[in-house]
């Protein structure tokens, strides 16, 4: 939770692999997460901050292996 000039500002950071999420996909993520915080936690959508970081698959590992290599195997 961020506080700016006494106003609580929920902050959500979404990290996804950089594999073709469109602007429309990202708009849906931002809208959906904002609405979820409003519905579940009664947070004000006007002060909710959502950021999306797209990480190259060469910079993301799962189970000791780069996502790039996992994708080559269809995992």
Region roles according to the model:
Residues 8-23, 27:
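N-terminal acidic leader/helix
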């Amino acid at each position: 939770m961020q506080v700016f000039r006494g106003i609580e500002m929920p902050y959500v950071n979404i990290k996804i692999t950089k594999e073709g999420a469109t602007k429309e996909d990202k708009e849906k993520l931002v809208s959906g997460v904002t609405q979820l915080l409003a519905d579940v936690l009664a947070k004000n959508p006007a002060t909710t901050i959502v950021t999306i970081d797209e990480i190259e698959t060469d910079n993301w590992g799962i189970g000791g292996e780069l996502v790039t290599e996992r994708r080559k195997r269809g995992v």
